[in-house]
Amino acid sequence: MKFNRFTKYLIVFALILLSTTTLNYTTSLRAQEPPQVQITQPEPNPIVPDSIFMSQLPSWARLVDIRTVNPNIRLDIRYATTNNFLKRKLYPISKCALRSSVAQKLALVQTDLEKIGLGLKVYDCYRPFSVTEQMWEVMPDPRCVANPARGSRHNRGAAIDLTLVDRTGKELEMPTPYDDFTEKAHGDYQGGSAESRKNRQVLKDAMKKHGFIGITTEWWHFDSEDWQKFAILDISLGTIP
């Protein structure tokens, strides 16, 4: 079929008009589409290697020996002995290490308790991640040991296991001994003696005042309320000054 020049121009014009209309319509549809939301999965807390530990952590986040902050806090670091539920020595030395800011808060708890003739005795503080792995290998039970897949708040240097003592260092009566994983160790257990429940509450109130939160299953365990800001560490206790 042959077209004269005018007809050809008319066809070209029609095609241009059709293309413009289609483009405008498509643009209009895109403008009406809701904006795409990009969801970013949070990165897991990194394990900080020994080589950069001291040099890169800010002073408030470094691990410190609690005895350098308040020497009046008594120690009975059970995992440095065989006197624990695993019957194994897991720490090379008896030391309570905590993040500096956490240690400062615990020192304030000790100071307050001394005003009423009491004090703290610590069973466990910072726990290297590799020790948690060892514990899980022996007893892979989340009721007793933190699953290494998530890590422990002890691994962050932001958790403490402890009890109360009198002026002479004698432990006050509590509902259970340390590392008793029965319901009697729960924070709301109403059995046992009235004295043990009162002492448990004194400890809880003293810790809460300075920013520590207890857990439901262990009367002796307290987390710093800001524990999430600290990364999991695997620093040997022997390297902490």
Q: What residue ranges belong to the model's regions?
A:
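Intrinsically disordered, low-complexity peptide-like regions
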Residues: 2, 22-23, 122, 219
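Bacterial N-terminal signal peptides that target proteins for export
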Residues: 2-11
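Bacterial N-terminal signal peptides
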Residues: 11-22
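Extracytoplasmic cell-surface/polysaccharide-interacting catalytic and binding patches
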Residues: 27-123, 137-217, 223-241
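Segments that shape or occlude catalytic/ligand-binding pockets
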Residues: 128
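Short, well-ordered surface patches within globular domains
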Residues: 131
